[in-house]
Amino acid sequence: MNSFKRIPFFNLVILLAVSCWGHAFAQTPPVAIKPIRPSQKASVMQTIGVTDITITYSRPPVKGRPIFADAPASMESRHPGEATLDNQNERKAGEPIVPYNHVWRAGANEATLFQVTDDVLINGQPLKAGSYSLHTIPGKDEWTVIFNNDPGQWGSFSYDSKKDALRVKTKPQMVADNQEWLMYSFDPVTDDSAQVNIRWEKLKVPFTVQVKDVKSAWRSKADATIAANPTNEVLPLQVANQYAAWKNYDEALKFVDSSIKTKETFRNLSAKANILWAAGRKDDAIATADAAIARGKADKADTAAFEKRVADMKAGKL
């Protein structure tokens, strides 16, 4: 005889419902009220080519306090070596917020977060794509900028130099205007680089982020996207258009042909005609243009503007 008691169906339904509700409740994140921080959170982002660089940090104010200075002996003795002295609970009146020769979070609250989507050069030194905590060691005449492999730490209190991915040197610059709230900026920016500036009080600390080969980084991502979407004829066409803009017509034709092979459309045939024309292959361009118009009419596409362009091609007006 079965020793288990039968559970009435209605009771079983109730038990299951309560169980599911309890599980859902357990998965709900806790409710919290966001505090107002004296050092407010900020983020700045710059794209170089197709590489995104994002810096997330907190912005402490000066508020008349001494910022950059040598640590007095009493302060220095608390944490010897490079260890951070950035502890407001230990700091005495008149002591600097950022004492020289000690690790600083380059912000407030959590360690400053530096994220980059591709491999880059920092002041000419290689840094892999990834997320890093950014720390500095300030000095009167030279600063060390540190990219550390522990991105989730609070301040620099658990900073471990063994986890450093990169250290670079830079020269601080005195400026005339006072920056009350610490600020990161990207300026100047070029086609393949951006200068990051840490500004606070009357000091600017710059370092450069460079993408070694912008076009190769773009091509690598383009190839990966096309490989992941082999039936999408638009993607290789987009690559073809980019190469055409660079006047690299051989590569442009290679990709537009790939698009046509995937699926022949008025859009990619007309694009090929324009590329051939730009490359100086006028007879091939006109033949392809006629094929594009025929394809467009068959697909009920609007070919009017392109037909006018082709007429100008044939009349020698372009």
Each model region followed by its residue ranges:
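Extended, well-structured beta-strand/loop surface patches
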Residues: 56-129, 135-232, 246, 263
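Structural register within alpha-helical repeat arrays
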Residues: 239-240, 272, 310
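Terminal, low-structured helical/coil segments at or just beyond the last alpha-helical repeat
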Residues: 291-318
